[in-house]
A protein has these predicted regions:
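A contiguous strand-loop segment
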Residues: 1-64, 100-101
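Short, basic/low-complexity N-terminal boundary segments at the transition from targeting/disordered tails
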Residues: 2-19, 79-89, 197-210
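Stable alpha-helical elements in mature extracytoplasmic
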Residues: 32, 36-43, 69-73, 82, ...
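Structured loops at beta-to-helix junctions and adjacent beta-edge loops in soluble globular domains
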Residues: 39, 46-48, 108-110, 119-120, ...
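Intrinsically disordered, low-complexity linker/loop segments enriched in Gly/Pro
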Residues: 51-102
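C-terminus-biased signal that marks the final domain/tail of proteins
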Residues: 85-89, 98-102, 110-112, 145-222
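Catalytic cofactor-binding cores of redox enzymes
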Residues: 92-125
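Aromatic-residue-lined binding/catalytic grooves and analogous aromatic/hydrophobic interfacial grooves
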Residues: 113, 122-158
Length: 222
């Protein structure tokens, strides 16, 4: 898995030298932003800006055990051997988004199966109670409800807006929609099958936030 140490309060421009920083690094395995395990299950996290004018983190409060964004990824990487197992694991917990913002997640496995995990309640304009959200799992073989091109494709892709049908009104902003469209164009050109890891990295470079000509301010994104 990969971990951004700045999310743990460590200056990424300096070496880890102080005792407290070294102790903090012991927690790094539990703060992944993406990763893949030995069974071929991979997962990643992406900001979604849910809550209308003010982003509201998911904060589900039932009688289930609690889980944060990054510890959920750690759970999947440690214990899931397939997308289905990942989904069943996550359903056993209450989600509490990290860093005071909201996210959705994508999981894939070696069989080609994938799923997008989203916690929502109502529409973008009314989704302002993080405790009222429920988990929705969108599998790649059952995503025609999202849109025509999604239903016609065997692959999934994701950026920074919620994919649940009807979540946004006609005038609501969908963060990352332009990059979402570009990723689709690149993947559709080869029916979602890329020759090697370099080809995948090339697509990520095309839509990377540092080089993309817009005003995106997100940190957890494609």
């Amino acid at each position: 898995s990969t971990v951004d140490l700045q999310f743990l309060g460590i200056d990424q421009e300096k070496d880890v030298e102080g005792l407290m920083d070294k102790i903090t690094c012991l927690a790094a395995p539990f703060a992944p932003l993406d990763g893949m395990n030995d069974a071929g299950v991979s997962c990643g996290i992406y900001m979604t800006y849910q809550g209308g004018d003010e982003t509201i983190p998911t904060d589900v409060d039932t009688d289930k055990p609690d889980l944060t964004s990054t510890t959920m990824l750690r759970l999947i990487l440690d214990y899931a051997d397939s997308v289905e197992e990942a989904g069943e694991l996550v359903k056993q917990y209450d989600m509490h988004d990290s860093a005071n913002t909201s996210y959705h997640y994508m999981v894939a496995d070696a069989s080609g199966k994938s799923a997008i995990l989203e916690w929502t309640c109502g529409t973008d304009k009314t989704d302002n109670d993080g405790s009222a959200r429920t988990l929705n799992v969108i599998y790649n073989d059952d995503d025609g409800r999202i849109g025509e091109r999604e239903g016609a494709s065997d692959f999934q892709w994701i950026t920074n807006f919620v994919l649940q049908p009807g979540y946004y009104g006609g005038d609501d902003e969908k963060a990352g929609l332009d990059r979402y469209d570009r990723i689709y164009e690149e993947l559709a050109a080869t029916d979602g099958v890329l020759p090697d890891v370099n080809a995948a990295m090339d697509i990520l470079k095309i839509v990377g936030r540092r080089d993309w000509n817009n005003d995106d301010g997100n940190g957890c994104t494609v």
